Amino acid sequence: AQGATHHANSHFKILDEEGEWVDSDRLSEFAFGKLGEKVPQGACRRAPANSKVEWEIHYYPDGNAVANDQVAVGIWYYDEEDGFNEEEAYRQDLRAYRLDGGGDYMIPPHGTLMTQGFHSFDHPVRVDSWQPHMHLRGVAMALEMFNPETGRREMLSQASNWTAGWNHSHMYEDGYQPLIPAGATMIIT
């Protein structure tokens, strides 16, 4: 099979107190089959002053680089003339919230495995998009919220009959983004 970019992730690097380059916030994330991502109105990703961008790219199916491969990211800067107000904007978090374990799983032929990951925030969160990603063996993924104040568990998104060529970042429409209250738990299954 011909090789293709499987992941192309970029993040900012900043200088620490000792003058060493260290990782900072993620800039973008790409997975095979993803069409791109859009930052919603009123949101931002901050580019630290004097930072640089580092790429982490790997290839599928054999891990070998693809000759003449090109990966790009576009950055738009906004300021007061654009009507952008940094104090009112909320900062997007592109962190990958993984399933527990994060290691190798032993799945027998024709077998199944179900894993879950949990994450809570100490502040309210608006979910702008959700991207299931399970490589070759995954068949379904769900994003739920458990609210300890109500004792209710709510399904936010689900992808069933999943395929590895379908790594789209599912964007919620304006006004329909799930709101997760402080202390609630996201459940990824």
Question: What do the PLM-derived regions correspond to, one by one?
Answer:
Residues 2-126, 131-189:
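Beta-strand-centric surfaces of beta-sandwich/beta-rich domains
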